[in-house]
Amino acid sequence: MLRRMIEFQDLCLDVTDVATAAAFWGPALGLRPDPERPECLVDGVPEHSLWLNVVPEPKTVKHRVHLDVHVAAVSDLIGLGARVLDDSQRWTMLADPEGGELCAFVRDPGTLRDYRLYEVVVDSANPAAIASWWAERFGVPVQHGTDSDGEVSWLEGAMGPEIEFVFAAVPEPKTAKNRLHWDVRGDVDELVAAGARLLRRPDDDISWHILADPEGNEFCVFPRQ
C-alpha cells in the first residue's frame, strides 16, 4: 500500500487583473467567484478551487504549467476571450485573455461534467523522474508513455477523481516562476528530506511555506487539517 505524504488542496494562478481572469476561468472550469472572496473561484468542492493571485509582472514566457479543459466547443472559450494558438492536434491550444496557455479537448456535450478540468500539465526535463517523485509524495501509482511530443508520465488520483497530473518532456529549461501552481497539505520537513527545496517560510505576509520540487516547480504547503 502506497503511503500518502501529502494531500492536494487547490490550484493558484498568477494574474494581473482578477475580474478579467475570473470572467474567463470561471466559465471555462465551471466555477464561480466566492461571494466573500471574489479572487477565489469555487463550486462547493474545496479541491476544485482556483485562487487568482494578483501579481505586478505580466506573463513573459510560455507557461510551464497549464490546464487542459473539457469543452463542448472551442468556440465557447473564444467567446470568453481566448484566442487559438494551434489547432493542428486532436486538442486545441489557446491563450487566455492574459496570454496564458491552455488546451481544450472537445467532448460530447452529454458527457461533460459541471467541473471542466481535465489535466494539470507540467513541462519537464525528466518526466519519468519528476512524476515518480510526486507519485511517492501523493501515494499514487505513476504511469509512463509517449505522445506526439515525446515522453510523458502521469498520475491519476493525486488531485482528485478524474483529474490527471501530467508531466511532459520539453527541451527548454525553467527560467521564471511558474504562474500556475498547486497547494498541498503536509509536513514541510518530510518534503525537504525527500528532495524539495524551501523557498520561503511563513512571515508577516503569508501563513504557509513555499517550496520547489526537484525540477524547481513552486508549490505551497499548508498544515494538515
Model-identified regions with their sequence ranges:
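Glyoxalase I/VOC metalloenzyme domain signal
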Residues: 1-37, 42-86, 95-149, 153-205, ...
